[in-house]
A protein has these predicted regions:
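Well-ordered beta-sheet/strand-loop patches within structured domains
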Residues: 1-172
Length: 172
Protein backbone atom coordinates (compact mmCIF):
# COMPACT_ATOMS: atom_id res chain seq x y z
CA UNK A 1 0.00 0.00 0.00
CA UNK A 2 2.88 2.39 0.68
CA UNK A 3 2.85 5.33 -1.70
CA UNK A 4 5.39 8.07 -1.08
CA UNK A 5 7.49 8.59 -4.17
CA UNK A 6 10.67 6.59 -4.47
CA UNK A 7 10.34 2.88 -5.10
CA UNK A 8 8.48 0.70 -7.49
CA UNK A 9 8.86 -2.99 -6.79
CA UNK A 10 12.28 -3.71 -8.28
CA UNK A 11 14.27 -2.44 -5.32
CA UNK A 12 15.42 -5.91 -4.28
CA UNK A 13 17.21 -6.00 -7.63
CA UNK A 14 18.73 -2.52 -7.24
CA UNK A 15 19.74 -3.10 -3.61
CA UNK A 16 21.44 -6.41 -4.42
CA UNK A 17 23.24 -4.93 -7.42
CA UNK A 18 24.29 -1.89 -5.35
CA UNK A 19 25.91 -4.18 -2.80
CA UNK A 20 27.72 -6.14 -5.51
CA UNK A 21 29.02 -2.94 -7.13
CA UNK A 22 30.20 -1.62 -3.74
CA UNK A 23 32.13 -4.83 -3.13
CA UNK A 24 33.60 -4.80 -6.65
CA UNK A 25 35.08 -1.35 -6.04
CA UNK A 26 33.42 0.29 -9.03
CA UNK A 27 32.51 4.01 -9.02
CA UNK A 28 28.84 4.63 -8.23
CA UNK A 29 27.58 7.83 -9.86
CA UNK A 30 23.95 7.75 -8.69
CA UNK A 31 22.30 6.00 -5.77
CA UNK A 32 19.22 6.82 -3.69
CA UNK A 33 18.24 5.25 -0.38
CA UNK A 34 14.65 4.30 0.33
CA UNK A 35 12.36 6.81 2.03
CA UNK A 36 12.04 4.51 5.06
CA UNK A 37 13.87 1.47 6.38
CA UNK A 38 12.88 -1.78 4.72
CA UNK A 39 13.19 -4.57 7.27
CA UNK A 40 14.05 -7.44 4.98
CA UNK A 41 17.09 -5.57 3.63
CA UNK A 42 18.42 -5.57 7.18
CA UNK A 43 18.01 -9.32 7.85
CA UNK A 44 21.58 -10.17 6.79
CA UNK A 45 23.02 -6.67 6.46
CA UNK A 46 23.22 -3.51 8.53
CA UNK A 47 20.88 -0.63 7.66
CA UNK A 48 21.90 1.92 5.05
CA UNK A 49 23.13 -0.38 2.28
CA UNK A 50 20.10 -0.19 0.00
CA UNK A 51 19.24 1.45 -3.31
CA UNK A 52 15.87 2.38 -4.73
CA UNK A 53 14.95 2.95 -8.36
CA UNK A 54 11.87 4.54 -9.85
CA UNK A 55 11.56 5.27 -13.56
CA UNK A 56 12.22 7.86 -14.91
CA UNK A 57 13.61 9.95 -12.04
CA UNK A 58 15.50 7.75 -9.57
CA UNK A 59 18.21 5.39 -10.77
CA UNK A 60 21.24 3.39 -9.76
CA UNK A 61 24.24 4.16 -11.97
CA UNK A 62 27.84 3.01 -11.92
CA UNK A 63 30.88 3.14 -14.18
CA UNK A 64 33.04 0.28 -15.41
CA UNK A 65 36.44 1.94 -15.03
CA UNK A 66 38.44 -1.29 -15.30
CA UNK A 67 39.33 -0.92 -18.98
CA UNK A 68 37.89 -4.38 -19.57
CA UNK A 69 34.50 -5.99 -19.98
CA UNK A 70 32.37 -6.88 -16.98
CA UNK A 71 29.76 -9.63 -17.09
CA UNK A 72 26.95 -9.25 -14.58
CA UNK A 73 25.16 -12.50 -13.81
CA UNK A 74 22.04 -12.66 -11.67
CA UNK A 75 20.60 -15.74 -10.04
CA UNK A 76 17.27 -16.00 -8.28
CA UNK A 77 16.60 -18.89 -5.92
CA UNK A 78 12.92 -19.35 -5.20
CA UNK A 79 13.67 -22.05 -2.62
CA UNK A 80 15.90 -19.74 -0.58
CA UNK A 81 14.07 -16.52 -1.53
CA UNK A 82 17.47 -15.13 -2.48
CA UNK A 83 18.79 -12.97 -5.32
CA UNK A 84 22.52 -13.04 -6.10
CA UNK A 85 24.64 -10.96 -8.46
CA UNK A 86 28.08 -12.09 -9.55
CA UNK A 87 30.36 -9.69 -11.42
CA UNK A 88 32.98 -11.29 -13.65
CA UNK A 89 35.93 -9.46 -15.14
CA UNK A 90 39.68 -9.19 -15.23
CA UNK A 91 41.06 -8.39 -11.78
CA UNK A 92 43.04 -5.16 -11.76
CA UNK A 93 44.38 -5.40 -8.21
CA UNK A 94 42.07 -2.87 -6.56
CA UNK A 95 41.26 -3.31 -2.89
CA UNK A 96 38.07 -2.23 -1.16
CA UNK A 97 37.45 -1.31 2.48
CA UNK A 98 34.08 -0.32 3.89
CA UNK A 99 33.12 0.66 7.39
CA UNK A 100 30.09 -0.82 9.10
CA UNK A 101 27.20 1.64 8.85
CA UNK A 102 26.70 3.85 11.89
CA UNK A 103 23.10 4.54 12.90
CA UNK A 104 22.30 7.95 14.39
CA UNK A 105 19.19 10.05 14.85
CA UNK A 106 17.00 7.07 15.71
CA UNK A 107 13.29 7.88 15.97
CA UNK A 108 10.60 5.33 16.76
CA UNK A 109 7.82 4.52 14.34
CA UNK A 110 4.63 6.54 14.88
CA UNK A 111 1.66 4.90 16.53
CA UNK A 112 -0.23 2.50 14.27
CA UNK A 113 -3.20 3.81 12.31
CA UNK A 114 -6.46 1.84 12.13
CA UNK A 115 -8.85 2.74 9.32
CA UNK A 116 -12.42 1.50 8.92
CA UNK A 117 -12.99 -0.31 5.62
CA UNK A 118 -16.57 -1.15 4.59
CA UNK A 119 -15.29 -3.43 1.79
CA UNK A 120 -13.87 -5.91 4.33
CA UNK A 121 -16.12 -8.22 6.36
CA UNK A 122 -16.85 -7.00 9.90
CA UNK A 123 -14.12 -8.06 12.32
CA UNK A 124 -11.48 -8.59 9.61
CA UNK A 125 -8.19 -6.79 10.13
CA UNK A 126 -5.74 -6.41 7.25
CA UNK A 127 -2.31 -4.83 7.63
CA UNK A 128 -1.36 -2.77 4.57
CA UNK A 129 1.73 -0.94 5.87
CA UNK A 130 4.39 -1.99 8.35
CA UNK A 131 6.08 0.10 11.02
CA UNK A 132 9.69 1.15 10.58
CA UNK A 133 11.80 3.35 12.86
CA UNK A 134 13.46 6.39 11.38
CA UNK A 135 17.22 6.88 11.40
CA UNK A 136 20.21 8.32 9.64
CA UNK A 137 22.94 5.90 8.62
CA UNK A 138 26.39 6.48 7.22
CA UNK A 139 29.30 4.38 6.04
CA UNK A 140 32.59 5.02 4.29
CA UNK A 141 34.12 3.20 1.30
CA UNK A 142 37.70 3.44 0.09
CA UNK A 143 38.96 1.82 -3.10
CA UNK A 144 42.69 1.66 -3.80
CA UNK A 145 44.47 0.59 -6.97
CA UNK A 146 47.12 -2.15 -7.05
CA UNK A 147 49.79 0.37 -5.99
CA UNK A 148 47.80 1.58 -2.98
CA UNK A 149 46.73 4.87 -4.55
CA UNK A 150 43.23 5.94 -3.51
CA UNK A 151 40.80 5.77 -6.44
CA UNK A 152 37.54 6.27 -4.53
CA UNK A 153 37.07 7.80 -1.09
CA UNK A 154 33.41 8.40 -0.32
CA UNK A 155 30.73 8.54 2.33
CA UNK A 156 27.20 7.24 1.92
CA UNK A 157 24.51 8.86 4.07
CA UNK A 158 20.93 7.62 4.15
CA UNK A 159 18.08 9.39 5.91
CA UNK A 160 15.04 7.26 6.66
CA UNK A 161 11.73 8.71 7.82
CA UNK A 162 9.82 6.89 10.58
CA UNK A 163 6.88 4.99 9.14
CA UNK A 164 3.64 3.93 10.79
CA UNK A 165 1.86 0.62 10.51
CA UNK A 166 -1.58 0.88 8.91
CA UNK A 167 -4.41 -1.58 9.50
CA UNK A 168 -7.73 -1.77 7.67
CA UNK A 169 -10.58 -2.81 9.97
CA UNK A 170 -13.57 -4.42 8.33
CA UNK A 171 -16.95 -2.79 8.96
CA UNK A 172 -18.90 -4.46 6.13
Amino acid sequence: KTVLGDGGGVCQVSTTLFRAILNAGLPITERHAHAYRVGYYEEESPPGIDATVFYPSVDLKFVNDTGNYILIQSKASEDELRLTYTLYGKKDGRSITMTTPIVTGYSPAPEALRQDDPTLPKGTVKQIDFAAPGATTSFHRTVKDKNGKIMIDENYVSRYAPWRAVFLVGTG
